[in-house]
């Protein structure tokens, strides 16, 4: 292509949620444009009216904005090449399809759905690839249908579609940035419908016209569009337009290497947003679904700026990319480590405040929502959580009394003498002037020695009493953060509620 500003586009259909595959397509287009000092635009391809879903446009836009993929031009942001919604460009498509009709590169087809299906079934029975039988190809284009019959139907206002005429006995060469040279035989390509009977164009016509008029230099899209590429290349030739460069991205696969589908897990960006994945982690993970820097580079954690700096289409592979949630979780944890404790405490506070609207705490709300208190929680739990919300949900005991106790831990840790030991030790804790981890640890060790028991005979049941679970951070630090009053209250409550259970 001649030297010009790089322009890429993401052109989704507003038929539902933003799929993670769509996020990857948008991201790669965004990264490539930004890496090369170009522009990235968002275009809505809403010509399939039967599949439109209310609210899908808003969902697409909000998901992309959440991910930090901000278009330079879009229905929301405007631009010099609008409208950016295909249903608002119908007159443009009619103009270009008329040009193809006038130049005998397209023709009217009045075949009914039943006729098309009957022909398709016959071809399958004959063992040939189903394609349109060209019944309505006019005589002056090499077919057998008289122009008079076509005109009669047009004059009567009968519903029809407009099809492109695929050249016979032609080999079509496609140079793909990712896949190299791919050849297509025109005998395998159907006379594609360009304009439907409702006056709306199909994807094939609209996308080619729009990409040309919007000066798109690179079409980066999923592998599923590779088989349609010969039709698009022919349309560029029909119109005499310079072709953009194409790059077809590898399929996304489930761990069993089947095509990624909702049956085996979440596929919507909003699902991962709801689960608490950060935008940095999800973008990082999605970027690695097909792309890497190459051999010898061990880096796997990237910021958006680093991705822009390092991304190239030449490093995108051809083979399918496995969507591994374990890898996503690892990347999520790495990104969490990069966030300051202060910022994490602020984010956790917002979650806790919402939680307190639904659930009452016996601890003073001004204490547990205090910045210093939350910072202590974050510092204690930072290495134990993967998501910001887990500072609240996984660590509820910092904010709420245990409502239940881990059953297996009761059977294993609550001995015949546990209630007596805890009741007495509670009095020792109450007498501590400095309720810090060192003082608590020292008091427990002395009391255990006095009673002739191992420290564990106190540590495990106290942890259960204070937190309701058998795992967590250092008990002494946990108790220090929660504070004397809450610890004493929880130990007393557990002694009242729990008893030794014989095996």
UniProtKB/Swiss-Prot annotation:
Its EC number is 6.1.1.17. Its main location: cytoplasm. Keywords: Aminoacyl-tRNA synthetase, ATP-binding, Cytoplasm, Ligase, Nucleotide-binding, Protein biosynthesis. It holds the Pfam family Anticodon_2. InterPro entries: aa-tRNA-synth_I_cd-bd, aa-tRNA-synth_I_codon-bd_sub2, aa-tRNA-synth_I_CS, aa_tRNA-synth_I_cd-bd_sf, Glu-tRNA-ligase_bac/mito, Glu/Gln-tRNA-synth, Glu/Gln-tRNA-synth_Ib_cat-dom, GluQ/Sye. PROSITE patterns: AA_TRNA_LIGASE_I. A motif ('KMSKS' region) lies at residues 259-263. SUPFAM superfamilies: An anticodon-binding domain of class I aminoacyl-tRNA synthetases, Nucleotidylyl transferase. One of its GO terms (molecular function) is tRNA binding. A motif ('HIGH' region) lies at residues 12-22. GO terms for cellular component: cytoplasm. GO terms for biological process: glutamyl-tRNA aminoacylation. Monomer. HAMAP family: Glu_tRNA_synth_type1. NCBIfam families: gltX_bact. Catalyzes the attachment of glutamate to tRNA(Glu) in a two-step reaction: glutamate is first activated by ATP to form Glu-AMP and then transferred to the acceptor end of tRNA(Glu). This is Glutamate--tRNA ligase. The lineage of its organism: Bacteria, Pseudomonadati, Chlorobiota, Chlorobiia, Chlorobiales.
């Amino acid at each position: 292509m001649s030297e010009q500003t790089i322009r890429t586009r993401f052109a989704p259909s507003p038929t539902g949620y933003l799929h993670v595959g769509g996020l990857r397509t948008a991201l790669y287009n965004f990264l490539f444009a930004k890496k090369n000092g170009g522009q990235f635009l968002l275009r809505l391809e809403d010509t399939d009216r039967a599949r439109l879903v209310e609210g899908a446009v808003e969902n697409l836009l909000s998901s992309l904005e959440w991910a930090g993929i901000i278009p330079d031009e879009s229905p929301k942001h405007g631009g010099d090449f609008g409208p950016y919604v295909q249903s608002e460009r119908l007159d443009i498509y009619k103009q270009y399809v008329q040009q193809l009709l006038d130049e005998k590169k397209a023709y009217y087809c009045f075949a009914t759905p039943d006729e098309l299906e009957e022909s398709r079934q016959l071809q399958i029975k004959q063992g040939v690839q189903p394609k349109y039988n060209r019944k309505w190809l006019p005589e002056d284009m090499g077919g057998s249908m008289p122009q008079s019959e076509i005109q009669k139907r047009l004059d009567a206002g009968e519903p029809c579609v407009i099809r492109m005429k695929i050249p016979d006995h032609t080999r079509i060469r496609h140079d793909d940035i990712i896949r190299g040279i791919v050849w297509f035989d025109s005998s395998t390509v159907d006379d594609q419908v360009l304009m439907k009977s409702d006056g709306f164009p199909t994807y094939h016509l609209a996308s080619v016209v729009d990409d040309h008029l919007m000066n798109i230099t690179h079409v980066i899209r999923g592998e599923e569009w590779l088989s349609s590429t010969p039709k698009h290349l022919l349309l560029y030739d029909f119109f005499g337009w310079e072709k953009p460069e194409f790059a077809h991205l590898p399929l996304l696969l489930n761990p069993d290497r089947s095509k990624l589908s909702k049956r085996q897990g979440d596929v919507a960006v909003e699902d991962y947003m709801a689960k608490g994945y950060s935008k940095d982690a999800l973008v990082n993970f999605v970027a690695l679904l097909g792309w890497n820097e190459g051999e010898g580079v061990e880096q796997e954690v990237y910021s958006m700026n680093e991705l822009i700096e390092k991304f190239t289409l030449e490093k995108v592979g051809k083979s399918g990319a496995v969507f591994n949630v374990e890898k996503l979780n690892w990347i999520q944890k790495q990104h969490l480590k990069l966030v300051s404790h202060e910022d994490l405490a602020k984010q956790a506070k917002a979650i806790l405040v919402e939680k307190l609207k639904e659930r009452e705490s016996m601890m003073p709300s001004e204490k547990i929502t205090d910045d210093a208190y939350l910072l202590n929680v974050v510092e204690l739990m930072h290495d134990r959580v993967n998501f910001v919300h887990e500072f609240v949900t996984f660590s509820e005991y910092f904010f709420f009394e245990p409502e239940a106790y881990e059953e297996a831990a009761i059977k294993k840790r609550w001995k015949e003498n546990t209630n007596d030991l805890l009741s007495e030790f509670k009095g020792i804790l109450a007498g501590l002037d400095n309720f810090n981890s060192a003082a608590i640890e020292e008091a427990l060790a002395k009391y255990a020695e006095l009673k002739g028991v191992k420290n564990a005979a106190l540590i495990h049941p106290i942890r259960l009493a204070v937190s309701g679970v058998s795992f967590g951070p250092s008990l002494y630090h946990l108790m220090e953060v929660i504070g004397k009053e809450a610890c004493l209250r929880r130990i007393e409550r557990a002694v009242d509620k729990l008893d030794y259970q014989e095996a």
